[in-house]
Structures are given as C-alpha cells and as structure tokens.
Amino acid sequence: MLGAPSPRRLADVLAVTAGLVASVRAASPISVSGKSFALNGDNVSYRFHVDDDSKDLIGDHFGGPATEDGVFPPIIGPIQGWVDLIGRQRREFPDLGRGDFRTPAVHIRQAAGYTVSDFQYKSHRVVEGKPALRGLPSTFGDAGDVSTLVVHMYDNYSSVAADLTYSIFPKYDAIVRSVNITNMGKGNITIEKLASLSVDLPYEDFDMLELKGDWAREGKRLRRKVDYGSQGFGSTTGYSSHLHNPFFSLITPTTTESQGEAWGFSLVYTGSFSVEVEKGSQGLTRAAIGVNPYQLSWPLGPGETFSSPEAVAVFSTTGVGGMSRKFHNLYRKHLIKSKFATQMHPVLLNSWEGLGFDYNDTTILHLAQESADLGIKLFVLDDGWFGVKHPRVSDNAGLGDWEANPKRFPQGLPDFISDVTKLKVANSSDHLQFGLWFEPEMVNPNSTLYMEHPDWAIHAGSYPRTLTRNQLVLNVALPEVQDFIIESLSNILSNASISYVKWDNNRGIHEAPYPGLDYAYMLGLYRVFDTLSSKFPNVRWEGCASGGGRFDPGVLQYFPHIWTSDDTDAVERIAIQFGTSLVYPPSAMGAHVSAVPNGQTQRTTSIAFRAHVAMMGGSFGFELTPAEMPEDDKAQIPGIIALAEKVNPIVVKGDMWRLSLPEESNWPAALFISQDGSQAVLFYFQIRANINNAWPVLRLQGLDASAKYKIDGNQTFSGATLMNIGLQYQFNGDYDSKVVFLEKQT
C-alpha cells in the first residue's frame, strides 16, 4: 500500500538521514545506513530510501552536497483534507496502475493482460567499479573512479524482478542509472515501456534546455519553460536523429552559462528515444529518459532479461557551462574506448564536396598528391569507390557490394592505397595516411547483395519498401547481416593500409516488422561496432548519419569522432558546434573547411574565418579541391595547418568555456584551457560588421586569478584582470575572427 509515511517511520527515516548527512564529507562514494542510500560526489548528493510500509523507493535529494548536521525536511509535509498522497511522493521507479497518475517509468503487460505493477525492495549490494552492460554501450571505470549500487526489487504478484543499477563517478558529479527486468514467472510478459532513469525533483520552476534541428541544422539550443502538465520530445526514426538529441537539462530560470544550478541528462543509446518532463500539481517535476515506448513492446519469456540503456545525470552549481564540462570529461575518459579519444587528430582532406561521384584512380591520386603537397596528413576517399556489377557512380546503385570498382581502380584498391600512402607530406617526415568511406547498414535495390538477399532489407510483409536516397536499410538485428558487415569490412581493412574509416548512415527505418525492431537493431549494430573497433584498434573510426543524425553517446563508445553536420557553412557551424558542446566534447566533433560559396547556404566567408570555426572541432580538415581554390586562399593552407596542429591538443584535451553564445551575441567566443592550466586558446568571432559603436569587451573565465598570462607572446596580464576587466579586439567587416593564445607564466 502506498500512502503517507507513519510518524514512526518518518522519525526513523529522519534519524537515519541525520546520521548519514553528518558523515557526508568522510563518506565513501556510496553510503548505506539501514535502508537509506546516498551517492556522494565532489559536489553532488543523490539520496533515496525504502518506505517501510510500501517497500517503494522514495527519493530524498538530488542536488548539491548535504552537509548540514541536522535533519532533512520531511519528505511529505502535513496533509489537510482528503488527498491522494502518492502524487506527492518522489519515486525512484514509478510504476503503473496503483494510483500514481504521473508519467510511469515502467509499463509491463502480463500474460493475462494486466498492466499493474507493484515493485518492492528486496535487497541491495554495493560493488567497487562498474559492471559493463551486456550488449549495450556503457560508461566504464576502475574501483578508484566509480562505485555501483544495485537495488533488487520484485513484484510478488507478477513474478517480475527489477534491478536498478546506480553508479557514481564522484569526480564528475555524475550518476549513471540503468534497469534490468527479469521474468521470473511461468508466462510471457511484454515490456511496453522502461525508462532508464526517472527522477522527481521537489521544485516546480524549471526551464528545459535541449537540442533541436533537422538535416544540416543540428544541435540548435532551445530553452523553454517547463509548464504544467507533460512535455517532452524524442525520436521515432530508428536512430537518435537530426530532429532531437537524447539529452536535456533542467535549469532554474536564473541559471546562466556560468552561474546557477543545472541538472543534465544524457542517454547512452543510438536508437529511438523518449524524453518526458511532467510538472505536477503537488510541487514536483518528474523527468525521465529512455527507449521510445512506441518502438519497444518487447516480449520476455520465462527466465529472460531485458536491459535498458544507461542514462547519465550530472549536477552543476556553476551553470550550464559547468554541466557541459562534466559531461565532456566523463565521456572522454570513461565512455569513449578508442585510444584516439584524446590524441591529436591528423589534418585531413575528404574528397566528397570536391569531387562527389565524379572521379577515377588518376583524379583521386592527383587530389591526394595535392593534399600531401599542402601539408595535409590524411586523405579520405568518400562515396563512389565500390561496386562491380552495379558500380557506385551515383546514389542509385552499389550499396552493399563492398568490392572496389575495377574500372575506377584497375590495379585493385590495395595497390592504389599503397600508392597514396607512399606520398610524402610536405614539411614533415610523415607519409600520407589513407581513409575510406562506408555505409554498411544500407543496400541499394540495384546491387548484387539485394538481388541475392532481398529478405535482408527491413520490410513489413507485403507493404511497399519505401526508398530514401534510393536505398533500403539492412536488418542489422539479424546475426547473418551482422556477420556479413563484419566480414565485408574486415576483408578490406585487413588487406590495405587504411588508418581511418568514415561510417555513414543516410536514412531512418521504415516499415518495421515489429515494434521492438529498433532495440534489436541497436543490439546488432553495437555488436558490429564493438567487433570491428576491437579488431582494428589502430583505425580511427568516425561516425556520420547525413551529418549529425547519430551524434550520441552510444556511437561515441566505439567511434571517437562524429561528423557534426553536413552544413559546413562557418556561420551556421558556430551555432551547431556550440550547441553540440552542451553535452558532447569538442574533441569528438568533425569540422571541415569547405569551398565558397558554401554548398548549403551559398554564403562566402574568408578561408581564415572558415578555418578558425573548424578548429574548434577535434577532427579538423578540408572538403574541397585545392586546384580550384583562389591562389591567395591556397597559399594560406600551410599556415592554417600549422595553427590547427598547435590548437588541436588544447581543444582535444582541454576544458571549453563558452564565453558568448551565438544566439545571444554578434560576437560569439569560446575559450579552451589545457587540463594543467598552462595554456589556453581563445576563439573569437564577429558575424556582422559593427558600425559606429564601441568594440565589445570580452571577459574570460576559468583562469587562475593569481597567475600571470602572456597573450600571443606579447603583453602579460593577471588572470583576475582578464576575467574581471577582459580583452577588447577590433574586428574588420563581416565574418571576421581571432585566435588568441594565452600562456601561463611560472
């Protein structure tokens, strides 16, 4: 029975909590006292307890450290009149059908058709470190990095078990949660909904910050008031999507980039997802994130277990920027498995925007030679290199036939790649590296693969198979499709000197044959990602989905870089990259200099401006044909490369401070500070010319107030001066930019 706590139980809880709070500073990351639990980070506390009567898990606190020696306020205040008390409770795992009419975290359909659940606490265990999720991407860490609490719950009426796993990364004020559901009964059940994380916050005045967009305009910030009732967003596309990102933040109305409280939530998943925020009638706000229930309905037989993806929640008292830096550092160090996560990225040139499908071995080798002569270190051959019977000379044929086109590469792809990697990079002892584009999850009907295996394409019975970009999606939920992809790419990567792979995905899933296909597809895709990235650890993997359609933590587990957007216009990219950095580290962002007028916006900006914007991404490069560039621009490329190589280590490993936002200012700016604080680089932009007005003063952040900093090797100022008084620069005309280096003096 759920209801108000008895006076005896409330007194017991308060007494236990008082003792728990008094020892916070000396406590381990996870403290357990009786049936009260506390996860303690450097600047966060997450607390809940077991209700004595209902055996439900009741939330006590998620926010700053609770260091008061007294007691917590009552969980439920005095009640007057006839009220449904469950609507006032802060529940950790809200179920369905027993009087809590708010958004549930779990919805299970039993064999008899019942959808009521009654999960009660049974036991718990604490482990050092963090177990990996089976078949799903997940954060990782050793015993000194992370601790884990597993709470075992059970529904005695349906014989269904739920294990709630909480992990705490104290250094990053990050709580990670996932749920396992196990059918312990004799009949089948169906999981209709399972949120990875659901939390009730005892405040009702929030703004919600999220990332919205579409193709070529991903990652745009949206801040809106959390109003009464339910609101949310998600994806039903079969991938995380351009339209929304599996991330949101709840912030107070007064929270800014650098001040105020921010709760951030991020789902480690690549498929369709759902975010739900509900402002209730009793002063609570419920927030939940997980797999989209419209694409779940997962059958679970006796003895079977379903695992949710994990969700990451961080808390910051230093504004939205503080929240972002916690995500950045956690994901760089405890999510991305690749050794390239924090390594300097070689400057690359991608063939796509320069040549498209129109090339042969001679033109490609010439472009590679031009690249090497300019000092570029990695040449990437994009779409169009494959297909024997159905050559990929346009987007209507060849996908799925991963063999080199013999007409384009008569000596064979391995020998051609060997010719490319023999090229000497100018002003360097290096030879040119080679990268290759794939779209392994797709198939053209005009291909040998489709003609041999039409059943491998996702389809729903006799319904027409909808084409997008002249292609269909392979059913990666099938083990034979997974094996085909692994074998096809392994054959190519094992027989040629390929150091980089761009993995593309250019459409969503249509005509799914059953609701749970999306989740099954993701399990198969993660198996493919894990197998290939483990088998070829010396390959740099970069994800892409028509740009940033799959920029999510699930992909980042295996691929250290993701192409941020197909929009390479520098002005648009400032907003896209600033927005994406709300949760994702700039080290993961692919950002390139393309030709002008820009292919997406037709805007013309200087090559310096384009390059400075792109340098804010960890994977910096070019998408153009050097031979078609103006000579003045071409002459600047060696200097741009030298600057990019100087900037890149700070961007890849450092902390980002967004000083001025593109949606709020004509002068957006970001400061990157190295982890040891010894160096910093400032990116400062003017969008439109400033007429008859004073130049803005930019105050820096994140510096050591007592230290001295040399600015571009010239003047020296204290950190206090730079943060409290600031810098002032003169800009010239539209689309001007500055890159400024700061060096801490010892």
Swiss-Prot record:
One of its GO terms (molecular function) is alpha-galactosidase activity. Disulfide bonds: none annotated. Keywords: Glycoprotein, Glycosidase, Hydrolase, Secreted, Signal. It comes from the Eukaryota. Gene3D superfamilies: Aldolase class I, alpha-galactosidase from lactobacil brevis, Golgi alpha-mannosidase II. SUPFAM superfamilies: (Trans)glycosidases. It holds the Pfam family Melibiase. It catalyses: Hydrolysis of terminal, non-reducing alpha-D-galactose residues in alpha-D-galactosides, including galactose oligosaccharides, galactomannans and galactolipids. It is found in: Secreted. GO terms for cellular component: extracellular region. Glycans are attached at residues 43, 156, 180, 188, 360, 427, 446, 495, 714. Its EC number is 3.2.1.22. InterPro entries: Aldolase_TIM, Alpga-gal_N_sf, Alpha-glycosidase_related, Glyco_hydro_27/36_CS, Glyco_hydro_36, Glyco_hydro_36_C, Glyco_hydro_36_N, Glyco_hydro_b. Residues 1-26 form the signal peptide. GO terms for biological process: carbohydrate catabolic process. Alpha-galactosidase involved in the degradation of simple oligosaccharides like melibiose, raffinose and stachyose, and of polymeric galacto(gluco)mannans. Belongs to the glycosyl hydrolase 27 family. This is Alpha-galactosidase 2. The gene is agl2.
